[in-house]
Amino acid sequence: MASDLEELRGIGKVTAARLQDAGITSAYHLAIMNPEELEEMAGIDPVRASRIIMEARRVLKMTTEPVNALEYEEIIKENPRLTTGVTAIDELLGGGLEPGAIYELAGEYGAGKTQLCHQLSVTVQTFDEQLRGKALYIDTEGTFSPQRIRAIAPRFGLQPEEALRNIYVARVETVVALEEAVREAAPRLLENDSIRLIIIDSVIALYRAQFKGLEWLARRQQRLNYVLDWLKRLGRAYSPLYLVITNQVLTEMTPTKPGAALRIPAGGNIIAHASTHRLLLRKAGEKHIIRVLDSPYLPYKAQAEFKVTSEGVEDV
């Protein structure tokens, strides 16, 4: 709220009102902005913007002070993992999803990406009381299904209405709306409600549809990078926060094997560098396979099997 901002040194009622009008309603939200964004959104001079951002970070003790690797290892170990509800996938991921990391689920239509996202929206509600949270599901393709949540919830001991009440759905149809959802709506929800999971399904769809042609490629990649950068900022500032994006795939011919083709994630180097863990999903008969494409510590090409049933995503 404006009163929260006014408590920061260097921010009076006028500046607090300008920030609030721009959608920046708390010290936490202010602390993860950069000066150029404040100039664009609230008309604040970059030099002054830099000062008030640093003040917000100081008050919130958001330090960049390095720690030794042993201490860092302990911090990571203490992070609670989010279960997928599938033992084989949890084991593949080292115990479930880690907070702050971006998990990319890439695959063709019917590979199981959206099914897994729906299930994660439910499992995030099954933590113990202290960590139990809600989900923000940013839907760019109209694939979110309340009926699917109703079918999955009882398997995890939740009433369907309760599970649905704990999932916020943002249906976005333009790149601008997606950016607003991540930069403005998400921080507000994180401040005012116990959001523990953000899903973007799919992260690439709007960019491929609305930036057509090679002449728009550089602009498209810049805008895509901006949204992914905001996800990272949110993950660092509002821990524990779990981050999942889905991605489409492209067909790439292999020069060494004429007639053969590879399925590779769309989005180029931007998504490749932004994602912490890249996972490729595919359907194989009656079962589905999830395979590690890239990760800081998960074994390359390690995989797990799962099936999609009327009650969600399950072990084979």
Q: Residues of each region from the PLM?
A:
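Long, low-complexity intrinsically disordered regulatory regions enriched in P/S/T/G and acidic residues
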Residues: 1-7, 16, 61
